C-alpha cells in the first residue's frame, strides 16, 4: 500500500477555484483501479494552538493506492491531465509526498 500526502498551493485567492476543479474529478479518481482513498482537505478552522496550519491558499489531498503502478496510472489518467490543464495558471506549487508504512 502506498500513501500520498499532496500539498497544493494556489495563487492568492484562487484556492476555491482550484478546489472546485479538484472536486469535479474526484469521482473519476475514486473509480480508478487501485484507489483506496482520495480526500481533499483544508485546515480545521478552530482547532487551537497545537495546529500547524496549511494556510488560506493551500489544500491537501490524502490518498491511498494499492501499489506504485496504480499511482503512476493515476498521474496519467485523462481526468488528471484535464485537471492540470484547467488549473495550471492557478497553482503556485504542488508537493507530492509518496509514503509507505514505517
Regions of interest found by a model, annotated:
Residues 1-2, 102:
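Absolute protein N-terminus
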Residues 2-9, 39-75:
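Short, well-ordered beta-strand segments in beta-rich or mixed alpha/beta enzyme
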Residues 9-10, 32, 80, 91-93:
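Hydrophobic/basic alpha-helical segments enriched in Actinobacteria
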Residues 14-40, 78-84:
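Short amphipathic alpha-helical segments
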Residues 39-57, 82-102:
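Glycine-rich beta-strand-turn "strand-cap" elements at beta-sheet edges
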